[in-house]
Amino acid sequence: MEDFVRQCFNPMIVELAEKAMKEYGEDPKIETNKFAAICTHLEVCFMYSDFHFIDERGESIIVESGDPNALLKHRFEIIEGRDRTMAWTVVNSICNTTGVEKPKFLPDLYDYRENRFIEIGVTRREVHIYYLEKANKIKSEKTHIHIFSFTGEEMATKADYTLDEESRARIKTRLFTIRQEMASRGLWDSFRQSERGEETIEERFEITGTMRRLADQSLPPNFSSLENFRAYVDGFEPNGCIEGKLSQMSKEVNARIEPFLKTTPRPLRLPDGPPCSQRSKFLLMDALKLSIEDPSHEGEGIPLYDAIKCMKTFFGWKEPNIVKPHEKGINLNYLLAWKQVLAELQDIENEEKIPKTKNMKKTSQLKWALGENMAPEKVDFEDCKDVGDLKQYDSDEPEPRSLASWIQSEFNKACELTDSSWIELDEIGEDVAPIEHIASMRRNYFTAEVSHCRATEYIMKGVYINTALLNASCAAMDDFQLIPMISKCRTKEGRRKTNLYGFIIKGRSHLRNDTDVVNYVSMEFSLTDPRLEPHKWEKYCVLEIGDMLLRTAIGQVSRPMFLYMRTNGTSKIKMKWGMEMRRCLLQSLQQIESMIEAESSVKEKDMTKEFFENKSETWPIGESPKGVEEGSIGKVCRTLLAKSVFNSLYASPQLEGFSAESRKLLLIVQALRDNLEPGTFDLGGLYEAIEECLINDPWVLLNASWFNSFLTHALK
């Protein structure tokens, strides 16, 4: 084959093909079929442009014998065959001078008469299959596709063949000749099959025995055998009308494919009702920390010791009182529980040696708060299977809730920078291979952008709380253990800092299954007055427990300090995921990496440095009612991280359903934006599936409202 290529093609074409293959690390001596294919493609591109000119009047003309005096301009710019850098330079300059949209992939030609890029394809298979592959790959309405086959067939975008009949006939004749020359040397079959990696094993592979029986059993209805089904699938023409095919497949299906136009989609309907309430496992933007810098006390690192040390930094404690009762709870019990914590911490200090853990006395208020003896008695199924009216509890439908503004504020806060660093460089893992110097560079840049982010604080807080709670649940199953909520960070000056957010008291925790629940009471410090947004704090009982002096621009001011208390519960599986919240860093890093990769493949060099250091460039972050929001690369990193963290903090079945179903609608809208003329059936059913997930979850409702903003802007 190699000899044939060198005899059959012009030496210039052969040289260009060798160069192209070497650029991709391929050897023309080994991959001879590929060598022949590249030469053929190059020759077709050159023949396409040969003899076609534009005269001084701008008309397209064909000139076969050169008149040296004519002022003629080549009609086609040849891009194929140039090295990649040069090719992109040509494409960029064409785009700059003509205003044509820049293609994502290098095209083969540019047509100055029709003002469009052309992608030429030469296939040994059926033209329409190859055409669809090309169209799917380049996904651009602007680039014109023209496919030729060795059998004389052709296919072009909108059946617009660009060239006159004669020029195309010349190309087809040449392809036919190449095919005959190959066939006469016994090279054609191997060449023809190499395009598809054809002759799949399956064709010669006999399925026998159990596999054969399973195959026959799992056929769709109305097919008697595997052969019968296979023949049907092979003959299934993809370009027929879909409705007909569907009815052919099953008598029950009658889908009408409706075109999806800019006017088709409507906004998602968000539920009405009282505003939604906070449901995270710990306070986010409203949390307050009692902190010690450069901790060096005895027992530093033992949570209880650290907590007592942090509590001692505050001098404004006062007699607690309830400022926002919990609607359904016995609020006095919350008050008594906090007083009990203060008293028992005081007792610890009076002991000679402070213990490492503290189990609370099982008082009536804690038993109430932790649901002790509240679980219905379990009865063996054998003893009750004869009971006639055995049934599951009736559970109430959840009450629909409307979107409240606090959840957007929470998200905005999560994207902000704090004045402390919450992760060290190695939180994302170490290098293990040489390729990873680029990876570590990206990781270090990314870490620098997110280490001070509030979402990162939430990650470390979540990891700490879940780890401590899971440990205590396994180690002290019957005890009401007091668990401090702690995090560690570094100040701007690099000093270590230990923070106390409040406490958790866990209930009995005999967790056999992943989903068995452990109850706990959380009590968290805050400066937020709950009376400002009472709907947000529906599930909480809030006490006022002290006054804090704050330094402000106008000097010291005293602010009331609140304690947010609620009963809550979690399970082994939820704690396991909570302990792995650092994965959010990895997920958002990967999203940023794919942005860098896209940029690098266009520029054909690694763009990591430019990506993070070009401070002037802005990137799309998301859609708001105002339009597409843009920001620095750091802001993009922090926003992606915050989204990932909120997906973890507010994980729920509603979120799972909304993400899966709304993604389908998103893909349809994106297809419309890319002018792919999408069609849909049962769009109403899709809307129903999305909207049945919009019930009362704040994070899901916020995502739905973002989705509506996206719809508005995408369809303008």
Swiss-Prot record:
- Cofactor requirement: Mn(2+)
Which residues of the sequence carry a binding annotation for Mn(2+) 2? E80, D108
Q: Name one GO molecular function term.
A: RNA binding
Where is motif Nuclear localization signal 2 (NLS2) found?
184-247
- The EC designation for this entry is 3.1.-.-
What the record notes about the co-factor is: Binds 2 manganese ions per subunit.
Q: Which UniProt keyword terms apply here?
A: Cap snatching, Endonuclease, Eukaryotic host gene expression shutoff by virus, Eukaryotic host transcription shutoff by virus, Host cytoplasm, Host gene expression shutoff by virus, Host nucleus, Host-virus interaction, Hydrolase, Inhibition of host RNA polymerase II by virus, Manganese, Metal-binding, Nuclease, Phosphoprotein
Give start-end of the signal peptide. Answer: none
Top EC class of this enzyme: hydrolase
Entries under InterPro entries matching the protein: INFV_PA (IPR037534), PA/PA-X (IPR001009), PA/PA-X_sf (IPR038372)
**Annotated coiled-coil segments of the chain:** none
Binding-site residues, Mn(2+) 1: H41, D108, E119, I120
Where is the motif named Nuclear localization signal 1 (NLS1) mapped on this chain?
A: 124-139
One cellular component term from this protein's GO annotations in UniProt: host cell cytoplasm
**How does this protein assemble?**
Influenza RNA polymerase is composed of three subunits: PB1, PB2 and PA. Interacts (via C-terminus) with PB1 (via N-terminus).
What task does this protein carry out? Plays an essential role in viral RNA transcription and replication by forming the heterotrimeric polymerase complex together with PB1 and PB2 subunits. The complex transcribes viral mRNAs by using a unique mechanism called cap-snatching. It consists in the hijacking and cleavage of host capped pre-mRNAs. These short capped RNAs are then used as primers for viral mRNAs. The PB2 subunit is responsible for the binding of the 5' cap of cellular pre-mRNAs which are subsequently cleaved after 10-13 nucleotides by the PA subunit that carries the endonuclease activity.
Q: Under what name is this protein listed?
A: Polymerase acidic protein
The species is Influenza A virus (strain A/Chicken/Scotland/1959 H5N1)
